């Protein structure tokens, strides 16, 4: 709608409705209320204040948008959670952590924690599964090296939820999959820029953590704790406040960590790594070799939703990769999975609440974007100086920060403005792959604010508080990612995507 035909009163009420609903959503979500109820209520509140038909927005805007998100991405949530639970119960994640501990040792404790977390999450293991396994490993290493316990959350965050989530090409993280239907890209979009961004994040994060370790040593500050991680992991998983925040920000319900049966007979490092390697290799083969060679013209038919291979191929590739890895994992570890049905049930169940929670956030964003006054917000975002890349980065950063969810904020941004950015990319000669990489990295920056579910869960698992550890999480998780984002935008603007 042309904003010039709206009266000042209508514009004012519309903007007030958006802000009031957002404040309501953030405030109650931070207190642990379920977003499944908060999101539709907040959306209806905004619609009512704006003078829009409330029930029509609930059933025709909110629900249709949420259902579209589930239709596009539920297979990835399902397979990702199932794979993560199988990796945990087979002892594979623990075996990788033990190998890192043995090979790198206490004198390289921070590096061991970062590499261990990166290996399992880049291979497709859900973030929360990695938290509950890497935290005890980090506790043992930090205690042996007498490194302050307060640095543990930042070290784990650097390895599990920064570059492996948003920058490394081919990562099966849901955030890396979301732009694919909007831009017709693959998980390997802008691989060179993604690798450079990863180097920036890792280098900056390790530099900061090493600096803090040296300062602590000079001040005679030691570990000063006990094995809080192993003692607090299970209660943290079941705490309702943590659970409600966590399922909005990541694709695994931490409640299901407690279910199933974790094998005490650990596989070898090679066996444990095989499924992770298969995820990356199969994903690459599908997106680079197989899918480009198949005839998928039939997808344009009404029967298949009048879509295209460019819109669905990236998701197909990740789905096949995770499926191949799951089959291989079960075959390699069958005797270590005596309660296979319980493990599979727990993994499948772990995907439901997160996908519904993020879908509800997406539905909320769709209602906000459908309000007439949103045209003002849209014009402001698109009018930000620096071109489409800067505008896209700012929009995604803000929405990820406000929702406390990288996937939710990213989807809301692309639902509202994705087609516009694609048109601007064609106008400015920007490769859609560059849009993809900028959007994904942007989603993983300001999402790590204090109310983010992953931050809350990580601190609980490590037995730390915001006061003790959040500053270092900000430095390695937010500042490092923002620095990498600036590098990618500058390089992409100068030399394009590569």
Model region roles, listed by residue range:
Residues 76-80, 103-140, 355-368, 382-423:
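Hydrophobic alpha-helical transmembrane segments of multi-pass integral membrane proteins
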Residues 31-35, 70-73, 84-94, 121-133, ...:
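Short helix-coil transition sites and intra-membrane helix breaks within transmembrane domains
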Residues 100, 104, 348, 458-479:
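Interfacial loop-to-transmembrane junctions
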Residues 17-29, 40-49, 79-82, 116-121, ...:
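Hydrophobic core segments of alpha-helical transmembrane domains in multi-pass membrane transport
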Residues 15-19, 37-40, 74, 107-115, ...:
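Hydrophobic alpha-helical transmembrane segments
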Residues 2-82, 95, 99-103, 278-360, ...:
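Hydrophobic transmembrane alpha-helices of multi-pass solute/ion transporters
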Residues 2-18, 50, 192-343, 461-462, ...:
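Long, contiguous bundles of hydrophobic transmembrane helices that form the permeation core
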Residues 107-120, 147-164, 190-195, 199, ...:
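Alpha-helical transmembrane segments of multi-pass membrane proteins
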């Amino acid at each position: 709608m042309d904003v010039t035909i709206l009266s000042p009163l209508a514009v004012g009420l519309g903007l007030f409705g958006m802000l009031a609903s957002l404040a309501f959503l953030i405030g109650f979500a931070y207190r642990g209320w379920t977003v499944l109820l908060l999101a539709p209520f907040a959306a209806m509140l905004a619609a009512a204040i704006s003078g829009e038909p409330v029930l029509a927005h609930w059933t025709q805007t909110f629900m249709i948008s949420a259902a579209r998100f589930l239709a596009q991405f539920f297979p990835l949530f399902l397979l990702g959670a199932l794979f993560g639970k199988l990796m945990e119960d087979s002892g594979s994640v623990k075996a990788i952590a033990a190998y890192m501990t043995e090979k790198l040792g206490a004198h390289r404790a921070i590096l061991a924690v970062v590499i261990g977390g990166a290996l399992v999450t880049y291979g497709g293991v859900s973030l929360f599964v990695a938290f509950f396994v890497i935290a005890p490993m980090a506790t043992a290493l930090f205690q042996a090296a007498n490194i302050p316990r307060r640095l543990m959350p930042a070290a784990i965050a650097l390895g599990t939820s920064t570059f492996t989530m948003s920058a490394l090409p081919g990562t099966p993280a849901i955030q890396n999959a979301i732009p694919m239907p909007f831009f017709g890209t693959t998980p390997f979009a802008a691989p060179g820029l993604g690798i450079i961004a990863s180097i920036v994040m890792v280098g900056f994060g390790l530099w900061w953590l090493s600096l803090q370790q040296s300062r602590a040593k000079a001040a005679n500050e030691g570990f000063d704790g006990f094995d809080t991680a192993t003692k607090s992991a299970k209660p943290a998983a079941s705490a309702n406040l943590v659970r409600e925040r966590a399922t909005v920000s990541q694709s695994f319900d931490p409640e299901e960590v407690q279910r199933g049966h974790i094998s005490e007979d650990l596989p070898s490092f090679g066996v444990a790594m095989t499924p992770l390697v298969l995820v990356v290799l199969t994903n690459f083969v599908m997106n680079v070799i197989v899918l480009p060679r198949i005839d998928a013209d039939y997808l344009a038919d009404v029967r298949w939703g009048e879509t295209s291979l460019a819109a669905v191929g990236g998701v197909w590739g990740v789905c096949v990769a995770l499926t191949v890895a799951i089959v291989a994992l079960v075959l390699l570890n069958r005797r270590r999975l005596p309660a296979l049905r319980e493990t599979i049930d727990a993994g499948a169940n772990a995907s439901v609440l997160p996908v519904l929670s993020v879908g509800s956030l997406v539905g909320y964003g769709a209602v906000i974007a459908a309000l007439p006054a949103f045209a003002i917000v849209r014009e402001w975002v698109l009018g930000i100086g620096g071109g489409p890349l800067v505008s896209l980065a700012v929009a995604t950063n803000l929405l990820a920060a406000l929702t406390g969810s990288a996937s939710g904020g990213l989807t809301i941004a692309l639902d509202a403005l994705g087609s516009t950015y694609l048109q601007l990319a064609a106008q400015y000669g920007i490769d859609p792959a560059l849009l993809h990489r900028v959007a994904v990295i942007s989603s993983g920056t300001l999402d790590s604010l204090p109310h983010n579910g992953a931050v809350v869960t990580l601190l609980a698992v490590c037995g730390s508080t915001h006061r003790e550890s959040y500053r270092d999480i900000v430095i390695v998780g937010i500042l490092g990612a923002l620095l990498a984002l600036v590098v990618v935008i500058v390089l992409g603007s100068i030399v394009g995507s590569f």
